[in-house]
Amino acid sequence: MLSRTILFSTSFLWVRVANAAFGITTSDDSYVIDAGSANPLKFTVSRSSCDITSINYYGSELQYSGTGSHIGSGLGSADVSAVEDGDYIKVTCDTDTLTQYFVVHNGDSVIHMATYTTEEPSVGELRFIARLNSELLPNEEPFGDVSTTSGGEAIEGSDVFLVDGETRSKFYSSQRFIDDQRHCVAGDAHRVCMILNQYETSSGGPFFRDINSNNGGSYNSLYWYMNSGHVQTEDRRQGLHGPYSMYFSRSGTPSTDIDTSFFANLDIKGYVATDGRGTVSGTASGADSSFKWVVHWYNADAQYWTYTSSDGSFTSPAMKPGDYTMVYYQGEYKVAETSVSVTVGSSTSKDISGSVETGDTIFKIGDWDGTPTGFRNAENQLRMHPSDSRMSSWGPLTYTVGSSELTDFPMAAFKGVNDPVTIKFTATSAQTGAATLRIGTTLSFAGGRPQATINDYEGSAPSAPTNLNSRGVTRGAYRGLGEVYDVNIPSGTIVEGENTITISVISGSSGDEFLAPNFIFDCVELFQ
């Protein structure tokens, strides 16, 4: 019996190894790519459309059978070719304005990808979507079922659902670009992760976020959104997007430290190797050290960022040569901006300094960090709809300086829902002179902006903010252009003793409940 068991085990191992035959199998319709990995990975690419139509990993079919995995909603048609070059296989899909690459290294159960564009797709967004078997890969990581919409009832558009009493949306899977190096879908025996180490040609900056995954029932979607119109704050960039990698494993979560420098030897359009780049090093100073500091570089062609060390020192990622705007953030709040030039093969030295400047503070609600952190419902807003029963009451609320908790102040004001927001404070005789009420916002919807009344004085109505033409707060977004509004308060308006401020939402537009004109608070400060 023992000898038969050994023989069976040995035969099973031999079959696994035998199946791991690195190479390309070509038919009239498709290329079958065998990664030659110990845990066998084979995937099939259509020669007419560039769709991935099969992903067989460790003996299980992980690709959804109804629709392929592809760029956008599929290229429709493309010139597709595949070549084997030593330890690498490259599949190239060409259209007039886009080239998609799939690259495999011998022995690795990883599909490396890159997308080269010369113009934005007509749909106004650029994404890769892997449509995967939701029975074998039902789970979404790292945020769980907040974006599992299977069996739900649509409550807003076609992308926010009510599932078992909880609001869910694919948008609730998002993570800030600066923190999103990996997101996954998984099951008991398989895990597929998107590894993202290069955002240079994406759009939106370090704090932009977009859809990462969505189990809609028929299949579980694993995405990489390179750009979109989802609260987009800058023009889309063209060129090479990536490399990005789809990593297959049986259990453990893979490292994000993946070397893709071999792309330099594979004739990939737009790829710039490390020796064709430069860096920027320096020290940031002046901002509040209780927040993380971020330095961000961008121009029309590329974007980069890094957290600083605790002492403010930083070194950029390897950057393409060129002239860049350089921004310093306290949290997500811009405190300084300058410019810098990057040259090939060198490290440019550039320090940056800045801080939040106001005046003698009478009161401050929240922090100047570019986020609504700490305000009521802010801790839930990323992962659920404002109407969710798990949210606290939106109000209208009254915040009393000196006695209220920060959670007594709403993260957002919605016209006709919870406005006006009321602030009560006590002033001394020395504080009755001219003052400034500064209202920081992070995002506006439908032209919503604040108008303040201080006691009997009505502040002027500010002009409408830039329209980003995208739902925000209801889809888990809080960051837009970060408009800051100053209300100049004449001397004598503030009185010794009790004072009342109301902040209302004004807009020429209208909408129902949480789709009414609205804005999200960053910080409210009264100073002289």
From Swiss-Prot:
Chain's role: Pectinolytic enzymes consist of four classes of enzymes: pectin lyase, polygalacturonase, pectin methylesterase and rhamnogalacturonase. Degrades the rhamnogalacturonan I (RG-I) backbone of pectin.
One term of GO molecular function: rhamnogalacturonan endolyase activity
Protein name as catalogued: Probable rhamnogalacturonate lyase A
Claim: Lyase is one of the keywords in the record: yes
Gene3D superfamilies: 2.70.98.10, Carboxypeptidase-like, regulatory domain, Galactose-binding domain-like
Keyword Secreted: yes
Subcellular location: Secreted
InterPro entries: Carb-bd-like_fold (IPR013784), Gal_mutarotase_sf_dom (IPR011013), Galactose-bd-like_sf (IPR008979), GH-type_carb-bd (IPR014718), RG-lyase_II (IPR029413), RG-lyase_III (IPR029411), Rhamnogalacturonase_B (IPR016590), RhgB_N (IPR015364)
Family membership noted in the UniProt record: Belongs to the polysaccharide lyase 4 family.
Keywords from the named record: Carbohydrate metabolism, Cell wall biogenesis/degradation, Disulfide bond, Lyase, Polysaccharide degradation, Secreted, Signal
One Pfam family linked to the record: CBM-like
